[in-house]
Amino acid sequence: MLKKINYFFQAIIIYLLFIIGRLIGINIARKIFSYLFLSVGPLFKSKKIIENNLKIFSDKLTDSEREKIINGMWKNYGMTFIEYIYLDYFKKNNSLVSAKGSENIISLTDNKPVIFVSGHFANFELMSMEIRKRKIKLATIYR
């Protein structure tokens, strides 16, 4: 029962953050939530897991390099969090998404199979949204 009450209050906090994010607009919300996640994120127990994973990735990283990666990750989480409530905006507005080589996508409408591999910054759903805008059938797998 306590778990359900805890989840209820967590949901209220998330919804309030979404409402605030929607009220202040996407550009300001991205900045504020990047800073918020950067400030609050390291307080969670996942901090040790993140640090250990980076040590496994490369034991040659300096402390400042590791810290820079971790800070970038928390900022990215902040942007991703807030962008979920703006997915409808991204569907209508192309100016916020950039894709190098997007001219190559046009030639893919002849129903031949293709695999897209992407790097992403912030919200990873945006790539598939942009491809689907071009009327290309798409199945998406995230890992």
Language model features with spans:
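Membrane-anchoring hydrophobic helices of lipid-metabolizing enzymes
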Residues: 2-118
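Catalytic core of membrane glycerolipid acyltransferases/transacylases, capturing the structured
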Residues: 112-143
